[in-house]
Design a protein with these regions (language model features):
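Glycine-enriched, solvent-exposed interface loops adjoining structured elements
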Residues: 1-225
Length: 225
């Protein structure tokens, strides 16, 4: 059957398992676990989104669907200034500094961004980031994965169902896991080809960062003296 909607997917999973008594588990466990899997593993163009963040304090909340930063910059006076990621440990080294100004670095602590220097006024930040795919539900009946790569949902859910049920033929379990992995890899490969065509990928050399980024190194060094 065609897997066009959330309802189609749940019906298909039940048919493949030959079980009509797993309605709750299919919706709340198998599909949800599959979504957690691919949101964790995939970083493809369809996941990239952008949002504007007002940076006027040392910490600002992450977007609710946030997975990973792609790039982050502040626009001030018509100029874009890239924000550099530093580790929480590096941020702790400069914590307590009286330095304020336009932030030039950030880290992530829990569900928050943390900036240094501490902003001395309100700045407009632009965050381009990888976002979770919208979860399927009775009100959100489809998304990019189901519409374009339904095998990810189907075989991922079957794999998680097999682990839940136990007693599934090992060969079938291995087959479902293999099909699930293949579907994920196919999506990643298609995404790379759409971006780069058949051109070979080249390893990037060291990137020299100038300007505000050097300020953080200086702040960390001065705080260690």
């Amino acid at each position: 059957m065609a897997l066009a909607t959330y309802s189609d997917l749940k019906t298909s999973i039940a048919n493949w398992l030959n079980r009509s008594d797993l309605t709750t588990e299919i919706a709340n466990d198998f599909i949800v676990l599959t979504e957690a899997d691919f949101n964790s593993k995939l970083r493809v163009r369809k996941m990239i989104t952008s949002t504007s963040i007002t940076i006027d304090s040392e910490t600002e909340s992450l977007p609710t669907d946030f997975l990973q930063v792609r790039d982050f910059f502040i626009t001030s006076g018509g100029t874009k200034y890239a924000l550099k990621y530093i580790t929480p440990a590096q941020m702790d080294q400069i914590r307590g500094s009286s330095t304020t100004g336009m932030p030039s670095a950030y880290t992530i602590l829990g569900d928050n961004f943390r900036f240094a220097p501490i902003p001395d006024s309100a700045y407009t930040g632009t965050l381009n980031y990888y976002a979770k795919f919208a979860a399927l539900s009775d009100t959100n009946t489809s998304n990019y994965i189901l519409a374009s790569h339904p095998a990810i949902y189907l075989y991922g859910s079957l794999y998680h169902a097999a682990n839940f049920l136990g007693g599934v033929d090992p060969q079938r379990l291995q087959q479902w896991q293999g099909m699930y992995t293949t579907a994920l890899e196919r999506l990643e490969r298609n995404d790379r080809e759409d971006q780069y065509g058949n051109a070979p990928l080249q390893q990037r050399g060291d990137v020299t960062v100038s300007g505000a980024f050097n300020d953080i190194s200086r702040i960390i060094t001065s705080n260690n003296n």
